[in-house]
Amino acid sequence: MAIQKLENYNNKEAIREEVTILTSILEEVAAQMMPAETFAKIVELSQLSRQDDYQALIAIISQLNNDELAVISRYFAVLPLLINISEDVDLAYEINHQNNIDQDYLGKISTTIDMVSKQENAAEILEKLNVVPVLTAHPTQVQRQSMLDLTKHIHELLRRYRDVKLGLLNKNKWEDELRCYIEIIMQTDMIREKKLKVTNEITNVMEYYNSSFIKAVTKLQREYKRLAAEKGIVLNNPRPITMGMWIGGDRDGNPFVTAETLKLSALTQCEVIMNYYDEQLYKLYRNFSLSTSIVNVSTAVKMLADLSEDSSVYRENEPYRRAFHYIQMKLANTRDYLVHNKPSDVRYSNVAEFKADLLAIKQSLVENKSMALLKGDFTELLEAVEAFGFYLASIDMRQDSSIHEASVAELLASARIVEDYSSLSEEAKCHVLLKQLETDPRILSATHMPKSEQLEKELAIFAAARELKDKLGEEIIKQHIISHSESVSDLLELAVLLKEVGLVDVDKARVQIVPLFETIEDLDNAPDTMRQYLQLDLAKRWIAGNKYYQEIMLGYSDSNKDGGYLSSGWTLYKAQNELTQIGQDYGVNITFFHGRGGTVGRGGGPSYDAITSQPFGSIKDRLRLTEQGEVIGNKYGNKDAAYYNLEMLVSATLDRMVTQMITDPNEIDGYRETMDEIVSDSYRIYRDLVFNNPHFYDYFFAASPIREVSSLNIGSRPAARKTITEIGGLRAIPWVFSWSQNRVMLPGWYGVGSSFKRFIDKHPDNLSKLQKMYESWPFFRSLLSNVDMVLSKSNMNIAFEYAKMCESEEVRNIFHVILDEWQLTKEIILSIEQNDELLAELPFLKASLDYRMPYFNVLNYIQIELIHRLRRGELSKEQENLIHITINGVATGLRNSG
């Protein structure tokens, strides 16, 4: 029997019971907030939706006035939020329960380490493994921080419901508290009135570290070492999970990211982890009341105690307490120096010194037979220090290649080296850049020529990066990503800019230069680009200084918008294969940074399946992947969910590393030609609609809420890099978000049905061939399973109502093209999977959608009516906010956005 996903163990009855309680309280709160006739409309709309009587539902909605729509929208937006909380609580319960009874589930770390332990090089695998979830901000993250805080309170109350049922807590008091928070939610603005600033995004993401990441990462690292030790594998300093972050350093398309935000991002996370250490040290100070009249201590601990300023006579015989007091004081001085530039002679120069003091205490406890004290708070602190050091996450810097080129061109012109650099050929550009990097020691910016604002900002943020690395350590900023990388000159231009502040010289690069290949064309050309780069003597030296590792980032969002779902997935797969082989040819370990979003249209889907379906050889011992703003709350909103999702990332990576050692990659060689043929058709079908159909642009802007999405105050970054006059100018994230809102989900499936149908029709054996591929090839199975999931969340009846907003019949007819492809795709997917219905292999998701769909379907119909009124000029400026409430509710119901 196949190992079950943990979600399959969920207690459907418990969820339904909790949802019934939440719904009942929400109804009571709504009834007291609005006129009786308005609440009666809510009851009627709910009944009609459950009965699938949407024509009657549409008729009622069209008769509601704007004030009625406001309160009704809020009700139906809150309901899926409460359902989400109940599901999250049950998942947290199951995570703990299944671990406590030692029940196996997919991604369980103990099972995975047992598998790894059977390999000859098990210790090397486990020691070197490093998986890095990189947290990003998100221009379509819809939840306000205030709403997230309120949901946390309800989450904690629901976690106590089992105690209420057992009579351990007073039910009336519990329900009153629950009612209080639901009432607050119903009276709290769901949508921001002001656009987020980068500083807000930094503060918001820090809350996840306080509530979940610090404890989850620490626990996972501790379990990882313990399980390895049980198998006789001694690990020195494993770091299976380290954290990354873009917030404060990702300025691609975001003019509000500056040198100041980079510093703030680094110093804020430094302060957060230091405060955590301070709290842990204080707990240890209070608890470690060991007396020298009873137990001995080491000389090292005595020395630490003697340095303490705790002169209380009551602690003369309590050296551990005084030692912790001294460490706490020294750490506080370190924090003040790093964060506030306050000098002190008594501070830690680096995290190794801090750790050494803690290890001295540990050694003393071991020597004096007090090992039980090493468990709990002390070990948790020590593991946190090993996992995080003096900052929580390494910050990535990112900028578009065109900005680098313009900056370098300005520098070269001001230094009178090349007047019009941008007009040079690629070969000539590389010649100029290599000369600057290899033989010209000049700082190009050290002229008296005036500089553009853009160049000043770029040089300032690079200087800030240098300052932070010097102060906090090399790993605070490890890589700089180049968006829209197309050529070797794109990589060398960044190197020239880094050279300006001393982060690159002829022998080493203190910041790794990471190309991001995004479009189908750039991914196809990536192997040639990297081959040319790896041949450079300069690049060889830089990579040697990075232990022969070279990272490459892969863009899932733009490649999907550019070529469609199948083309994106297959092009990324082939690019990884080729780039991995090129790395082997040059003695370089190519590692991949997967720029996945939350939705399938942006490379999303179940993390475990995504990782275990990567090409053979493409995962060695390092893997980085983005965790984008709108899914961070879903996956890491509490410490149990965070542990489970981090555990899955580590287990999946180990699984793929071991599997590729024991599996013959030639087994799938016969499938490549098939995929090339199908994907070629899919690419053409997708491009014919999205880029070549003259009516598609008008259809998208009329039959989706893209304009309303673009006006939402839901992120610091603009929705487009420039004014939107064509599909290519739109960012991938709001593109996908809008298709999610109108329930077409086009980026996750369009072009799949027709391309597979053509292949199947060519030969009677082709369907069985595809079925075999689905059964035996993880990549193909994951590819189609994601399509299955997207189709299940789409709703063509709702999509048709959006299509009616198109004024021209020619434009409106685009819907029928989409509908035909949707129906064909569903039919083909089920025939390849050999299933009778969608989500047959994901029963937990099917059950979840079945009981939440009726509620947030209502929101779609309300949204359509509101957009009609907006376009007819029947909504005031203030009432436009109602559309944003429906957008929020639909995204909440789908559990993802862009």
Swiss-Prot record:
Pfam families: PEPcase (PF00311). Keywords: Carbon dioxide fixation, Lyase, Magnesium. One of its GO terms (biological process) is tricarboxylic acid cycle. It catalyses: oxaloacetate + phosphate = phosphoenolpyruvate + hydrogencarbonate. PROSITE patterns: PEPCASE_1 (PS00781), PEPCASE_2 (PS00393). The keyword Plastid does not apply. InterPro entries: PEP_COase, PEP_COase_bac/pln-type, PEP_COase_Lys_AS, PEPCASE_His_AS, Pyrv/PenolPyrv_kinase-like_dom. The active site is at residues 138, 561. Its EC number is 4.1.1.31. It comes from the Bacteria. GO terms for cellular component: cytosol. It is an enzyme of class 4 (lyase). Its cofactor is Mg(2+). One of its GO terms (molecular function) is phosphoenolpyruvate carboxylase activity. Belongs to the PEPCase type 1 family. Forms oxaloacetate, a four-carbon dicarboxylic acid source for the tricarboxylic acid cycle. NCBIfam families: PRK00009.1. This is Phosphoenolpyruvate carboxylase. The gene is ppc.
